[in-house]
Amino acid sequence: DQPFQIRIDYKAEKKLDDVVFGIAIYRSDQVYIYGTNTLIDYSTSNTLDGEGHIDLKIERMPVNAGEYSIDLAFHRPDGFNYDFWREACSVTIQNVKNEVGVISLSHKWDVQ
């Protein structure tokens, strides 16, 4: 349940306005864990011109141990794809607990 950051390096051959950046996270068995993009998050309009990078900082990654893959997308607000990378990278999550399921819920036991 540690902070997690995704950095996407890009090189735009020409200036692109109103670019939406998106990610999707899948477990190794292709269970869809999470997805978001800058349009969903009401981010400001993004313009790409030349080279740079985009950082997505995730404050908590409360998934259980396992292998996960991340899809990356750059598209217009109307859905026209500039670029899409299926399984652009993979991540191994390790936990000290042996919980089961998809996520690790923050919890306390209170036995009286």
Predicted feature locations:
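Localized sequence-composition bias
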Residues: 1-112
